[in-house]
Amino acid sequence: MYELTPEQRTLQTQARELAQSVFASTAVQTDLTEQYPWDNVAQLRDAGFMGMMLPTSVGGRGLSTLDTVIVIEEMAKACATMGRITVDSNLGAIGAITKYGSEEQIKLAADLVLAGDKPAICISEPNAGSAASEMTTRADKNGDHYILNGEKYWITGGGVSKLHLIFARVFDDGVEQGIGAFITVLDDHGPEGLKVGRRLYAMGVRGIPETHLEFHDLKIHKSMMITFPDGLKRGFAALMSAYNAQRVGAGAVALGIAQCAFEEGVAYLKRREQFGRPLAEFQGLQWMVADMSVQLEAARLMLRSAAVSGETFPDINKAAQAKIFAAETANKVTNDALQFFGSSGYGRHNPMERHVRDARMFTIAGGTAQILRTQVASKILDMKLPQTRDGYLKAAQNSKR
């Protein structure tokens, strides 16, 4: 059903050649130094793998979500950090701006991404993670500008990204209008009022900094706010739909990491001997290999199915289902592959422990496996489950009556 076209196979080959010839050899260094791989990003840009889905009218390639997912898996198979950078430079913030932004906003974003920038999407806060609608960062209208104050948390690319898409509660004359999205560009010249806070050192995918962002009277012109004719409340839902593609992309990173661990584990089983024969001859390990291959192929099919669903962005439930399965598969497969190596797999000299660490983030970032299950269930059961603290309290009270 999802047989790749000749063009997609060519794209896959091109991505694989770059990833394996350049990114695979620097994956260990990227993990150990925890430094952003600027040279690799430049090669990703030069190969045309940043801004792939941008329309040709602004310099992009006009590729599909499925095309992008194919590339992401290959990048992640070589280096998890490069897989994540490929996601963020093609999906999420740039996708939302391309779909809902003005011509001026699209051109600004396209020029930055095509020049090698990895955009940062700024939603999460210290007290608003899965419940994103509980964010407290606010944007107060002041003439032709909005003044932003607040804090964001776990911002991927903080300190290296230029393009930022910031979500905040919008107020006009003290009256809340809803949650809006604002575009700003951080460079050596500012803007004043945007501060990159402390770095949050992560367990895996260490080549991209995760930081706090602080807004202290950050001034953004009204032309850099994404507007909707139906108002901000419906606009927020539309903007968040861009996250469906981001989730499919995140699942593809998890899959690439797991595929790499699987192939390395299988190769080890073939060459390692114990009790006078290769480990590959032990039936218990053979069954583990079979199960891992089934899980990987199922995850790949689910991700590709999600990628081609929906009109503008992937279907919300298919994206959630695919991310849940791919992320949990990656955690299972990387741990099983490490088990093949025994104590050697536990050592830092072995790439297996890195694969396990890298895979771990994907049942958390971009929607935890638990909150995504809640989302999937609400759709299947035709229920609107409460997404705020007050909503859960009211639901609990009603259930006791």
Curated annotation (Swiss-Prot):
Cofactor(s) listed: FAD
Transmembrane segments: none
GO terms, molecular function: acyl-CoA dehydrogenase activity; flavin adenine dinucleotide binding; hydrolase activity
First-level EC class: hydrolase
Coiled-coil portions: none
Disulfides per UniProt: none
Cofactor, free-text remark: Binds 1 FAD per subunit.
Keyword line: FAD, Flavoprotein, Hydrolase
UniProt binding sites for substrate: 243-244
Stored InterPro entries: AcdA, Acyl-CoA_Oxase/DH_mid-dom, Acyl-CoA_Oxase/DH_mid-dom_sf, AcylCo_DH-like_C, AcylCo_DH/oxidase_C, AcylCoA_DH/ox_N, AcylCoA_DH/ox_N_sf, AcylCoA_DH/oxidase_NM_dom_sf
EC number: 3.13.1.4
Effects seen without this gene: Deletion of the gene completely impairs growth on DTDP or 3-sulfinopropanoyl (3SP) as the sole carbon source.
Binding site for FAD: 121-124, 130, 153-156, 272, 339, 343, 366-370, 387
Signal peptide: none
Database matches in SUPFAM superfamilies: Acyl-CoA dehydrogenase C-terminal domain-like, Acyl-CoA dehydrogenase NM domain-like
Catalytic activity: 3-sulfinopropanoyl-CoA + H2O = propanoyl-CoA + sulfite + H(+)
Annotated site residue numbers, Important for activity: 84
PANTHER family: ACYL-COA DEHYDROGENASE (PTHR43884), ISOVALERYL-COA DEHYDROGENASE, MITOCHONDRIAL-RELATED (PTHR43884:SF12)
Family recorded in the similarity comment: Belongs to the acyl-CoA dehydrogenase family.
Other known facts: Does not catalyze the dehydrogenation of acyl-CoA thioesters. The absence of dehydrogenase activity is most probably caused by the absence of a catalytic glutamate residue in either of the two positions conserved throughout the acyl-CoA dehydrogenase family.
Function: Catalyzes the conversion 3-sulfinopropanoyl-CoA (3SP-CoA) to propanoyl-CoA by abstraction of sulfite. Does not show dehydrogenase activity. Involved in the degradation of 3,3'-dithiodipropionate (DTDP), a sulfur-containing precursor substrate for biosynthesis of polythioesters (PTEs).
Subunit structure: Homotetramer.
Protein name according to UniProt: 3-sulfinopropanoyl-CoA desulfinase
Species the sequence originates in: Advenella mimigardefordensis (strain DSM 17166 / LMG 22922 / DPN7)
Gene field: acd
